[in-house]
Amino acid sequence: MLKEFKEFISRGNVMDLAVGVIIGGAFTAIVNSLVKYIINPFLGLFVGAIDFSDLVFKIGNATFRVGSFLNAVINFLIIAFVVFLMVKGINKVLRQDKKEEAPAPKDPQLEVLEEIRDSLKKLDK
């Protein structure tokens, strides 16, 4: 069982996933910092509140933390946009690889010469 687990962990997909999760966690910290220390103060210039996490409204005893939700939405949009750019870049590289692998179209003159050659071979028989 230990051998099977070692084989499972050693597969490329599992290792890629582990690296992705670790980098994703670090990237989330960067995005949180970007939103909290750069984007929110910039938006705060227009709204009047620099820290959106304190933005709340109350109805009766219920407290709605709209600011925390806005922070989460901004984080999500930034992460989604970066992932979109990464996928777009990867797809572009993959398309270029496929173009390089595709055989070059035959030269029309070469095709005519091959037909002539084949016809001459038939005549010799």
UniProtKB/Swiss-Prot annotation:
One of its GO terms (cellular component) is plasma membrane. It is found in: Cell membrane. The keyword Transmembrane helix applies. Pfam families: MscL. One of its GO terms (molecular function) is mechanosensitive monoatomic ion channel activity. SUPFAM superfamilies: Gated mechanosensitive channel (SSF81330). The chain crosses the membrane at residues 19-39, 42-62, 66-86. The keyword Cell division does not apply. Its main location: membrane. Keywords: Cell membrane, Ion channel, Ion transport, Membrane, Transmembrane, Transmembrane helix, Transport. It is a multi-pass membrane protein. HAMAP family: MscL. Channel that opens in response to stretch forces in the membrane lipid bilayer. May participate in the regulation of osmotic pressure changes within the cell. Belongs to the MscL family. Homopentamer. NCBIfam families: mscL (TIGR00220), PRK00567.1-3 (NF001842). This is Large-conductance mechanosensitive channel. It comes from Ligilactobacillus salivarius (strain UCC118). The gene is mscL.
